[in-house]
Amino acid sequence: VAVAMSAAAPGLPPGITPGVAGDVVVGHFNDLDRTSSLVRGHGDRLAAVIVEPMLGSGALMAERAFLEGLRAVTTECGVLLILDEVITFRLGVGGLQGAFGITPDLTSFGKIIGGGLPVGAFGGRAEVMAAFDPTRPGAIAHSGTYNGNATTMAAGLVALAYFDDAAVTALNATGDALRARLNAVVASLDVEAVVTGCGSLMQLHLTARPVETPEAALAANGQLVKLMHLALANRGVFSSTRQLYVVPTVATRADLDLFVDAFTDALGVVAQASRTTTPVL
């Protein structure tokens, strides 16, 4: 059994069988008391707790106390703590775990470490990773057609060499400034929305509720989110359908200005629609 945190997207993805779902207990993001009770309540049956330090679906930050509490309760119960940094590892040379000062037992990686090529990886404490050592009796097999492929490894090494501490710091500052500009646009249009996130990752939520939990993020008006996606596309910006924005290192001031202008126009369309009738797309 594993504990996974509630995310800002409801239900199970297609293809997840009831048998798999039966081995997972869903915790409560940023609710330490309830999640700690789940961990303690499942005792020896619990293998791991897995959580994103910032939800990739929603760009909602975990509270430091929540992550510190998870580290404490998993250590207490002899349960592995896994941080999913597939999306968030771009936010620091040591990922968000470095920023929070949290040392997990395992970490999953992806995206940024591949230098633009598809990649996935995991790593952790030596005694945990020793289970995959092929020279040890009873080792867990970990093989795959594309494991350690030279092209991705070379691209990843070069990308990470350029994406050093100075580059990460500068990019996060650019992202924070952009998020502030977008929220200023939201305020100027008097629309029920907010842009959440950290550094170079951010997401627009079209809801009047304070977006502090996954449940609040789910309260966003889905039709207006679709309209925002369409309105941005009509202005030359191809955004993610859920309105997650990621700032690249190559973005220039002119690029950001173009995006803010398109965002302003598109959100104006959304604001007008929200005051009349919700469009059916």
Positions of the model-derived regions?
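Conserved N-terminal phosphate-binding loop of PLP-dependent enzymes in the Aspartate aminotransferase
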Residues: 1-281
